[in-house]
């Protein structure tokens, strides 16, 4: 469906630019969400390691 839409709207440069902006925006949001999830998972792992270390030391 993506290729079909591009072919249909190829003549409309305004739509083309708008479409590209939306795609870039979506990719940006997606990568940011991935980074946030990565940080959260990393934080949880680090917290777990710290807790285990503290328990081991006791």
UniProtKB/Swiss-Prot annotation:
Residues 1-33 are extracellular. The record marks 12-13 as: Cleavage. The chain crosses the membrane at residues 34-57. GO terms for cellular component: cell surface; clathrin-coated pit; early endosome; extracellular region; Golgi apparatus; Golgi-associated vesicle; growth cone; membrane raft. It is a single-pass type I membrane protein. Cu(2+) binds at residues 11, 15, 18-19. Keywords: Amyloid, Cell membrane, Cell projection, Coated pit, Copper, Cytoplasm, Cytoplasmic vesicle, Endosome, Membrane, Metal-binding, Nucleus, Secreted, Transmembrane, Transmembrane helix, Zinc. Zn(2+) binds at residues 11, 15, 18-19. One of its GO terms (biological process) is cognition. Proteolytically processed under normal cellular conditions. Cleavage either by alpha-secretase, beta-secretase or theta-secretase leads to generation and extracellular release of soluble APP peptides, S-APP-alpha and S-APP-beta, and the retention of corresponding membrane-anchored C-terminal fragments, C80, C83 and C99. Subsequent processing of C80 and C83 by gamma-secretase yields P3 peptides. This is the major secretory pathway and is non-amyloidogenic. It is found in: Cell membrane; Membrane; Perikaryon; Cell projection, Growth cone. Its main location: membrane. It comes from the Eukaryota. Pfam families: Beta-APP. Residues 58 are cytoplasmic. One of its GO terms (molecular function) is metal ion binding. InterPro entries: Amyloid_glyco, Amyloid_glyco_Abeta, Amyloid_glyco_Abeta_sf. Binds, via its C-terminus, to the PID domain of several cytoplasmic proteins, including APBB family members, the APBA family, MAPK8IP1, SHC1 and NUMB and DAB1. Binding to DAB1 inhibits its serine phosphorylation. Interacts (via NPXY motif) with DAB2 (via PID domain); the interaction is impaired by tyrosine phosphorylation of the NPXY motif. Also interacts with GPCR-like protein BPP, APPBP1, IB1, KNS2 (via its TPR domains), APPBP2 (via BaSS) and DDB1. In vitro, it binds MAPT via the MT-binding domains. Associates with microtubules in the presence of ATP and in a kinesin-dependent manner. Functions as a cell surface receptor and performs physiological functions on the surface of neurons relevant to neurite growth, neuronal adhesion and axonogenesis. Interaction between APP molecules on neighboring cells promotes synaptogenesis. Involved in cell mobility and transcription regulation through protein-protein interactions. Can promote transcription activation through binding to APBB1-KAT5 and inhibit Notch signaling through interaction with Numb. Couples to apoptosis-inducing pathways such as those mediated by G(o) and JIP. Inhibits G(o)-alpha ATPase activity. Belongs to the APP family. This is Amyloid-beta precursor protein. It comes from Oryctolagus cuniculus (Rabbit). The lineage of its organism: Eukaryota, Metazoa, Chordata, Craniata, Vertebrata.
